[in-house]
Amino acid sequence: MAAACTVSRGRLLIAAVVVLLIVGLSWGIGSAVAADGSASPAADGGKTVLRLGWTNDPDNLNPFIGYESSSYEIWAINYELLVGFRAEDYANVPDVGLATGWETSDDGKVWTFTITDQSRWQDGEPLTARDVAFTFNYIIDNELGMFVDYVKFIDKVEAPDDTTVVFTCSKPKANMLALWVPILPEHIWSKVDPSEVENKFKNEPPIIGSGPFQTVEWKKGEFVRMAANKDYWRGAPAIDEIIFLTYQNQDTMAQDLKAGHVQSAWNIPAAQFKPLNNEPDLESIRGVVIGLDELGFNCADKKKYPKSTGHPVLQDPAFRSALQYAVDKEKIVSIGYNDNANPGDSLLTRGFYDPDADFYWTPPADSAYTFDLDKARQALDEAGYTDGDGNGIREYKGKDIRLRLYARSESPESQKCGKLITGWFKEVGLDIDFQIIDDGALGDKQYNYEHGEFAPDFDMFIWGWGGDVDPNFILSVLTTGSIESWSDCNWSNAEFDELFLEQQTTIDLQERIALVQRMQEIVYRESPYIVLVYPLDLETANKGKWTGWVRAGNDQGLWWYNTQPDTYVAVHPEGSGSATAGGPNTALVVGVLVAAVAVGLVILRVVRRRGRRAETEA
């Protein structure tokens, strides 16, 4: 065997089955809290509890249904991966997931993994290679949409003994070490009807996994409570519980940070970034994350999808690419994101990858789309979209071009960007109907069906994607096969599809990089998306009274909300040592701090991973 990798046992983002789930607004229950930030909830016998604030409630705890990034965060510490990602550099290495080592055959088609014999399920049952084989075969045999692209080219998975699992592939599999598939307990999930797993099965707490924490309670719109797994095979977490508190108002969350009611918060208001950083004990960071926010077009082919309501001009790449010149990304960053983003261009995140393995494609300076309204007008003229009657609006087949643009009520950024884009597009001669709707309504429009036929009901939208460390996921979103599934723009390109398959089976890194970069170039020129920005996520933590915060991505990422367990396992009150040795803290009633607001709810960017809509709401 070749490419052996074995190390002695030592101690990320997002595709889903889109379901009709609208995050409900909740007027939260009040709670008595300790104001000094060093104490933790002690309603259950003095437990050390880490309280974290976020604005993005999980949509579903079933990993075959949920798609919000907050759901992924829960799964990342409730379950384990076969091969994990090292927090400091996101590298796939042994002993971060269940695998302690692996080997590949000379032809790259057979992968043999050795897994730890120390991990146990949170109900006490041993975790074995049979659970790993079951998880992957369950997905393969039932073609479960959320993970189906991860298992592409895997024919079968076998467990010859308790610590060995063998993957047999039809072709070499370049991303074999980067499969974000949570390993599930066979003794529980084998009883779940595959026909219901994508639409009915709720996976209600307590959720049995093998990770450092277990989800024991979830009140939608209020909180998620997770208990430490004291038998975690890499060592028990230093705390007893985590409470993820869902806020409907960012300013309230910021005030609770100042008061010490929460120890850290993700997606803090941009206006509060510096003030919070100036508070005693608090530190604020801007974290580089894998992801993008985009202006997407409904590119659905009217011949194949006659019920699509997308304007016909959006099928023309010349029309779409002309609009690239009509978007000022510097203003998008400064006005839309308060400078908490980097200008976007390519499909993969700039500045994220290792220089020796950089998949990002840089548009050549002499052919890059730069903001120039005159160039946009010229390109539209050359594409045949002119103003024939002199009313200031360009025409298609004698009728004014009127396009619907949707921004999300949950995202102030998308709303500000929508207003800017509406103004620029009007300046180049388009009639824009700008509307603000919620996530659920937008998802309904993107995955609309009329009498059983796919009928996407939109023209343009502003949303975003979270990605994986490996580029395969975000590339898969734009394949033809993902239409009616992960694709939200319904674009189809034969060369892109062919390259997508080829890069998956190209083991040589530099050869694969060349293929992936060519794919990005195609997307850039065809413009099914105009990539607006690579957002920076904002976090604040109480580093004065709590220690053990582990920042991911070579100190450029986040402390938490990064699908990495490191911070959750290590963080604890300053001077307490560990949860078992630190003793009780100041008494506090466990509750949820959710502001009661009827209008003007402010929730920052929601990164999502999308999948096909399930037939039945879970």
Residues covered by each model-derived region:
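Long beta-strand-rich cores associated with HINT superfamily self-processing modules
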Residues: A39, A541-G577
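Periplasmic binding protein-like
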Residues: L52, G124, Q263-N267, D281-E283, ...
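N-terminal lobe/hinge region of extracytoplasmic solute-binding protein
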Residues: G53-D106, N137, P206-G209
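Gly/Pro-rich hinge or "lid" segments in bacterial periplasmic/extracellular proteins
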Residues: G84-D89, V181-P237, E241, D251, ...
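Extracytoplasmic/peripheral linker and loop segments enriched in polar/acidic and small residues
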Residues: K109, P317-S321, Y325, V333-S334, ...
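Surface-exposed binding/hinge segments that line
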Residues: T114, V148-V192
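Ligand-site clamp/hinge motif
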Residues: T116, F201, N229-P275, T422, ...
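Structural transition elements
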Residues: P343-G388, R408-K416
